[in-house]
């Protein structure tokens, strides 16, 4: 059974809506390259749509009822949006769940060093990457540095016009005979992914006015360090001048190195999007927009969960494995007059969820790892993965046949183009999502997202048609599941 290309059904109204959504999506992923930025932007968008802080509602003892809209965050890196429906929460919710973290290079806690006239930053890669894809690539620096006095400094270098960028260097082909004989996972080792940030030494006293340092007291010791590592010293001076930070402040920093530059339209026909972090911000954004556009006269409560740490196992306080989701729903039920452990358990088990995560798009350049009858194709709509996992579905959530049938009905009734797929051929590899975690409550969960080419590469590819169908499908699910 072959699914029709979604583009064929669009009229001018559809195309205008599709292009508008794609344009806003390109802006979103270009301007929000970290989980913190995604969460902060989503909160601003939610508040414009009438959402209020759950923390404020709890503090004020405000009762919640049908039509009320609240948001809650965890450490600024995970977010839950809830719009209450007319039915009791204990009758279940319709939930979308996506993640807003993406593979990247994180700075180590003690990252800065000088070597042979270069200042560099040591990194530890985050998530599953092919190390060799990250060399000679313009990189931007995003994140925060928390100082001992309690202030938090935002770092954003490399994406504004006129900003410098950074990179990991590579070995010239003329001397790479041994390197080229290595396996792909050894061509560039993780410890070699160090960021080149400077080559200019500081000017010490007596050597020139710029970058001058004093020679008394503690400053004298700093001068000795600067004389020993002048390029590192100049980098530190620039950081101190711009951000008011010192080297020790890296100990309490979260700084991510990500591909520099905006997402772009791809192809002569502009039918695709190429950009960083589309796994899984393409599903996060479409889920967010669907949640914000959910109509006021909702029967079942609509929920969108945007979580962190999926790429490393959904662990920690901001991952789906934490109690953030459960605790937030408990707080809302208390304010809605449905407090208590038993109503909470009933609400969770009676809920339905789409785990909004991307799927591997069929790539004709690598056709051998796909089984075409059960592969996702760009341009054919929203993808449903009944199960994921690897090696005999290990680690997957396997949605029930009855739930798949119900989701099919919702999509068909809304005119949503969709397809079903596995990640690839049996035993070719595999992967997982957050789906198995909410499923532990007994709720129905199925993976549902957008097909992606070059997944986990610095630049990933999606189809505008699939982005549009994902938005339509997520909205239909929140309204009618």
Protein language model regions, located:
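N-terminal hydrophobic/helix-forming segments and targeting peptides
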Residues: 1-481
């Amino acid at each position: 059974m072959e699914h029709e290309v979604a583009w064929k059904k669009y009229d001018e109204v559809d195309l205008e809506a599709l292009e508008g959504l794609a344009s806003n999506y390109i802006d979103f992923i270009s301007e929000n390259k970290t989980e913190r930025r995604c969460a902060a932007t989503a909160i601003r968008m939610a508040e414009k749509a009438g959402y209020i802080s759950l923390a404020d509602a709890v503090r004020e003892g405000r009762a919640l009822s049908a039509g009320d809209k609240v948001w809650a965050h965890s450490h600024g890196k995970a977010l839950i949006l809830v719009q209450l429906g007319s039915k009791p929460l204990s009758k279940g919710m319709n939930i979308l769940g996506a993640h807003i973290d993406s593979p990247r290079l994180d700075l180590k806690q003690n990252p800065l060093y000088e070597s042979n006239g270069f200042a560099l930053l040591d990194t530890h890669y985050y998530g599953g990457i092919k190390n060799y894809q990250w060399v000679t690539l313009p990189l931007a620096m995003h994140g925060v540095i928390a100082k001992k006095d309690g202030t938090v400094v935002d770092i954003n270098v490399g994406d504004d016009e006129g900003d410098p960028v950074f990179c990991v260097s590579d070995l010239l082909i003329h001397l790479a005979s041994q390197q080229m004989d290595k396996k792909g996972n050894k061509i560039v080792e993780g410890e070699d992914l160090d960021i080149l940030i400077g080559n200019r030494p500081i000017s010490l006293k007596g050597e020139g006015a710029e970058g001058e340092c004093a020679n008394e007291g503690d400053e004298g010791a700093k001068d000795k360090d600067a004389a020993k590592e002048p390029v590192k010293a100049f980098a530190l001076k620039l950081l101190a001048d711009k951000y008011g930070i010192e080297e020790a402040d890296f100990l309490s920093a979260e700084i991510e190195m990500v591909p520099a530059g905006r997402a772009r339209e791809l192809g002569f026909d502009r039918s695709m999007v190429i950009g960083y972090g589309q796994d899984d911000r393409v599903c996060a954004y479409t889920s967010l927009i669907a949640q914000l556009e959910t109509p006021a006269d909702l029967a079942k409560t609509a929920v969108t969960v945007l979580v962190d740490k999926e790429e490393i196992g959904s662990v920690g306080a901001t991952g789906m494995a934490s109690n953030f989701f459960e605790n937030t729903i408990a707080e809302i039920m208390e304010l809605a007059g449905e407090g208590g452990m038993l109503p909470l358990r009933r609400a969770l088990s009676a809920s339905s969820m789409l785990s909004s995560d991307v799927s591997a798009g069929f790539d004709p350049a690598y056709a051998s790892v796909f089984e075409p009858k059960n592969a996702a194709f760009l341009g054919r709509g929203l993808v449903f993965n009944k199960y994921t996992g690897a090696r005999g579905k290990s680690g997957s959530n396997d949605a029930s046949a009855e739930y798949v049938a119900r989701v099919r009905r919702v999509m068909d009734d809304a005119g949503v183009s969709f397809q079903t797929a596995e990640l690839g051929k049996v035993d070719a590899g595999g992967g997982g999502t957050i789906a198995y975690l909410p499923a532990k409550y007994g709720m129905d969960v199925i993976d549902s997202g957008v097909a992606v080419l070059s997944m986990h590469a610095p630049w990933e590819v999606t189809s505008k048609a699939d982005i549009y169908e994902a938005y339509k499908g997520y909205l239909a699910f929140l309204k009618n599941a």
